């Protein structure tokens, strides 16, 4: 039976690989929607006023179909270091919130996850900035030829701190994001009329999608300002295509509200929300597919296509323990076949 909870039958590296591959597939599938979101946030060629279809069509006709996946390679590459840092940070933070019995509350779990995510985002922030720069540039007349070239060019032209432009918005945006997650998860039992540990897989999937949608909606203004700060550069054509001129984060908020109204802070939200269901749907499906392969490889199941358990195998054993047990019985079997003379 599939489960979204942590499975002790997988090694740490196997779980990381499952998460990385699932994330890469999800990002690749929803990359055109992510592009539409970022273009609307930055204000590139007034993409927020065109609509999703018109934005995609304009990019396709002017730059080619490959342009719909601009920046996706960098987004996929940063998954593994980001996941590793987030996991390490989570293990450190979770100890601080545990009670004497080693338990952690729902609120503490959300805060711990948010803090770990914030740390991983800050550590890998230069790759996020470069991803934005690659997405807003024209692939036919690129200012950056890839991750390494972009990193080197930005560092030489604008200095090291330019790679962290807008990072403060990540910290500020974590507050409404965590509040949105808490708001959803605190009301799950009322909505489903049952305890969390009895939720079905479909209910868990719906919970994740709703929590993501609410959290991202509340924190979206901070993400919009961050994208504008990331894209803006005097060394790029038209200052990176940003639709407002500003001198900092606070001024960027003011200029957006002044020129576009308060709703201008949510430009691109529709595309962002449309990618929630396919993103998590593909992520969960791909994670379970990879998980089945590793469970079969580790000897817990009879086939990589199903969750049918291997008879006689203790499913509570960890992979290393199961391997040692198999070696023990193999040696014992060989010893029993050896003649006494």
From Swiss-Prot:
The chain crosses the membrane at residues 16-36, 68-88, 110-130, 166-186, 205-225, 262-282. InterPro entries: Mit_carrier, Mitochondrial_sb/sol_carrier, Mt_carrier_dom_sf. GO terms for biological process: transmembrane transport. Pfam families: Mito_carr (PF00153). It is found in: Mitochondrion inner membrane. It comes from the Eukaryota. It is a multi-pass membrane protein. GO terms for cellular component: mitochondrial inner membrane; mitochondrion. The keyword Disulfide bond does not apply. Keywords: Membrane, Mitochondrion, Mitochondrion inner membrane, Repeat, Transmembrane, Transmembrane helix, Transport. Gene3D superfamilies: Mitochondrial carrier domain. Solcar repeats lie at residues 11-101, 105-185, 200-298. PANTHER family: SOLUTE CARRIER FAMILY 25. Belongs to the mitochondrial carrier (TC 2.A.29) family. This is Solute carrier family 25 member 43. It comes from Mus musculus.
């Amino acid at each position: 039976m599939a489960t979204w909870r942590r499975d002790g039958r997988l090694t740490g590296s196997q779980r990381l690989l499952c998460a990385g591959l699932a994330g890469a597939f999800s990002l690749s599938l929803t990359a055109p929607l992510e592009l539409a979101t970022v273009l609307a946030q930055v204000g590139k060629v007034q993409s927020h006023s065109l609509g999703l279809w018109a934005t995609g069509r304009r990019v396709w006709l002017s730059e080619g179909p490959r342009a719909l996946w601009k920046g996706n390679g960098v987004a996929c590459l940063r998954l593994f270091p980001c996941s590793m840092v987030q996991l390490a940070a989570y293990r450190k933070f979770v100890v601080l919130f545990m009670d004497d019995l080693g338990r952690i509350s729902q609120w503490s779990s959300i805060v711990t996850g948010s803090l770990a995510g914030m740390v991983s985002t800050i550590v890998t922030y230069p790759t996020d900035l470069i991803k934005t720069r690659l997405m807003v540039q024209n692939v036919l007349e690129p200012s950056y030829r890839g991750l390494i070239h972009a990193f080197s060019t930005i560092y030489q032209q604008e200095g090291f701190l330019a790679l962290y432009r807008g990072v403060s918005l990540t910290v500020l945006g974590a507050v409404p994001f965590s509040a949105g997650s808490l708001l959803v998860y605190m009301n799950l039992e009322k909505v489903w009329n049952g305890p969390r540990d009895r939720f079905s897989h479909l209910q868990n999937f719906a919970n994740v999608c709703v929590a993501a949608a609410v959290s991202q909606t509340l924190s979206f203004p901070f993400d919009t300002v961050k994208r504008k700060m990331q894209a803006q550069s005097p060394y790029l054509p038209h200052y990176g295509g940003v639709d407002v001129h500003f001198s900092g984060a606070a001024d960027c908020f003011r200029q957006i509200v002044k020129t576009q109204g308060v709703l201008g802070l949510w430009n691109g939200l529709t595309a962002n929300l449309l990618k929630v269901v396919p993103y998590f749907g593909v992520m969960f499906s791909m994670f379970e597919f990879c998980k089945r392969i590793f469970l079969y490889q580790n000897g817990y199941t009879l086939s990589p296509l199903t969750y049918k358990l291997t008879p006689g195998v203790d499913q509570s054993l960890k992979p290393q323990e199961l391997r040692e047990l198999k070696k023990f019985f193999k040696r014992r079997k060989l010893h029993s076949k050896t003649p006494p003379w």
